């Protein structure tokens, strides 16, 4: 609390966090008065959203902890609240105007744990629960994100983003059955192509739980 708000709780004050499965999985209930605060959530993510709500309300109220009061219960109205990055694996960003990617460089996945953790925390603080890390215009090395070549690094991303309630998504290459699978066609109406995609999806979900 001190690291986030700048002041420690005085003796006798407290913040209690608990699960209440009657709440929406991403919902929370926040109550605070007389130096005591309770945060309940429908899941650990719901509790996390409640913590961010507490910090947000503290900052906007402009009151000392002893005078701070809150009584709110909220849940997201939209199930998917997602950011779509157009990052390329060479480190460039299509239509990006503020620097290079911090996900990719030279066809490799960057694992900057402090920076990624700070980013995941920032996303959760405003209720973002999904992120696509690569450009929707998939080409070159990005086509291979759904293979063993990159599964290890993506597992590290899941370890970072999942605790903050942020689900990881990947943009895929329509021509992957041809480029990766050596098939003559990428026609989704072709049963062989559909079977290839089904197998690739199962492989991805098995090695990247939560993807």
What residue spans do the PLM features occupy?
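Mature N-terminal segment immediately following signal peptide/propeptide cleavage
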Residues: 1-3
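Short, well-ordered secondary-structure micro-motifs within conserved domains or adaptor modules
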Residues: 6-26, 37-38
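Feature activates predominantly on carbohydrate-active enzymes
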Residues: 22-210
């Amino acid at each position: 609390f001190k690291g986030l708000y700048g002041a420690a709780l005085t003796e006798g004050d407290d913040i209690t966090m608990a699960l209440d499965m009657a709440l929406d999985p991403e919902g929370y209930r926040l109550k605070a008065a007389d130096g005591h605060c309770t945060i309940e959530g429908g899941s650990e993510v719901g509790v996390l959203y409640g913590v961010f709500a507490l910090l947000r309300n503290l900052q906007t109220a402009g009151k000392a902890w002893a005078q701070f009061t809150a009584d709110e219960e909220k849940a997201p109205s939209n199930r998917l609240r997602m950011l779509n990055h157009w990052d390329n694996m060479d480190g460039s960003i299509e239509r990006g105007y503020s620097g290079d990617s911090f996900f990719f460089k030279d066809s490799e996945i960057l694992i900057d744990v402090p920076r990624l953790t700070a980013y995941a925390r920032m996303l959760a603080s405003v209720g973002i629960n999904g992120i696509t890390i690569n450009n929707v215009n998939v080409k070159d090395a990005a086509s291979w994100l759904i293979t063993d070549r990159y599964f290890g690094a993506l597992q590290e991303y899941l370890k970072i983003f999942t605790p903050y309630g942020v689900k990881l998504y990947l943009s895929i290459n329509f021509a992957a059955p041809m480029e990766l699978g050596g098939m003559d066609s990428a026609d989704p109406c072709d049963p062989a192509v559909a079977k290839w995609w089904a197998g690739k999806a199962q492989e991805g979900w098995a090695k990247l739980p939560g993807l």
